[in-house]
Amino acid sequence: GASGGDAAASGFTVSAGGSTVLGFSFSGATISSGCGTLTNLTLNGTATGLSGITVSDSDANSVPFEYYDGSGSGNLGECTVQVIHNSASPTVDIYLDGALAIEGFEYRAATGLLTLPTAFTVGIAPAGGAVIADFPFELADGGSYVVVATGLLGDNTTPFDLAATATTFGSSGSDVVGLEIYHGSTDAPAVDIYANGSALLTDFSYGDFSGFVEVPAADYVLGVAPAGGDPIAGFTAPLSGLGGGSAVVFASGFLSGDDPAFGLFAALNDGMVLELSALEQDC
């Protein structure tokens, strides 16, 4: 049989016959994509499960969908996610779909590579406290993503948020290193980034991701300059030992001199975070 769910709540008539479930509405009501449960199915007799399920619209076109059995399992895919705490805020607890997943997650810390379902909700709570914000995600099956906690709690200009981008973990060969760069300094202007004197990124603004790039596995001096200007800071990036791997390099802290001070950090695939040493001389 078939009953209930958001189809019934939206005024649909839902019925089942044989192997077909029909749902139709005389009011023209629709059900929002990705929201709620379409309908509940019950099995009679000796039936123990469902197979070969298809969902079609009124023109017999296939419609993508997700289904769950009584234990809550279903056809959700999986993706790979790394989470980085780059909000100058207190230590937090991270919840996934209401369950505590990361306890005591400190500023400038990172997880390793997590395997997660493609649809999930991240809850953020002060350490030991209740969840104060939820962030739903719907990602691609088989995809790889970095999620960065960024911005400032209670700030209207650069509010707290979870920024995410598709990326690649690892690299195409042992002689190159994969990089994803994130501008996470809330008071820093748009900048140009130089690697050993050559422009790597230009007009790179707060909240921007670079997109995945590969560079030769070597040690670099990264210069940071106001967009269109001369470098005002330099950092050493010892990447020679990371061939075949990758890192997420993120700008962090305040350029104004407030604590925590501005710096560049690199999150490795295993969750280790390296602070890139600042250079005193011009670069």
Q: Locations of the language-model features?
A:
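Acidic, low-complexity intrinsically disordered segments
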Residues: 1-76
